[in-house]
Design a protein with these regions (language model features):
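Conserved Rossmann-fold cofactor-binding substructure of NAD(P)-dependent oxidoreductases
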Residues: 56-70
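N-terminal Rossmann NAD(P)H-binding glycine-rich loop of SDR-like oxidoreductase domains
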Residues: 11, 15-20
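Conserved glycine-rich Rossmann-like NAD(P)H-binding loop of the short-chain dehydrogenase/reductase
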Residues: 26-40
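A short, exposed helix-loop element centered on a Lys and neighboring polar residues
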Residues: 111-112
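Substrate-binding pocket helix/loop in short-chain dehydrogenase/reductase
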Residues: 87-88, 95-100
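Conserved NAD(P)H cofactor-binding loop of Rossmann-fold oxidoreductase domains
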Residues: 77-85
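Rossmann-fold cofactor-recognition segment
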Residues: 44-59
């Protein structure tokens, strides 16, 4: 069974740079991004498999899991993120919830889903 890193947010500057670094070190990865056109370009450059999924969708893990097809995950790089910069007196509860919805909850769900796989690798 193949062992790969899982790179979520593979089309951003951090995720794409990490993909190239992993490839340069003769390691393997499975890329995940919401933009198929962009992630397929990185896949073509690296030869890595990929999934198209948006972490804000409730079924994003199922989409990824379907595409993994028996691949062992040896590490997760969560390269998705956003920061809403504004003075604290202008920040609303909705801003906090949106930030946690993107930057925190999806990565916790990923770790919960793949924790047994990560432990053995």
């Amino acid at each position: 069974m193949s062992k790969k890193f899982l790179i979520i947010g593979a089309t951003g500057s951090v995720g794409s740079s990490l993909s190239k670094l992993i490839n340069d070190n003769s390691l393997e990865a499975h890329l995940v991004a919401k933009n198929e056109e962009e992630v397929s370009k990185i896949s073509d450059e690296t030869g890595f498999s990929y999934s198209v999924a948006d972490v804000l969708e409730t079924n994003f893990i199922e989409k990824i899991e379907k595409d993994l097809n028996g691949i062992d995950i040896m590490g997760i790089a969560y390269c998705v993120g956003s920061i809403d910069l504004k003075p604290i007196n202008l920040v609303t509860k909705k801003d906090y919830l949106n930030s946690f919805g993107l930057n925190f909850f999806p990565v916790i769900d990923l770790i919960k889903k793949f924790q047994e796989n990560l432990k053995k690798n």
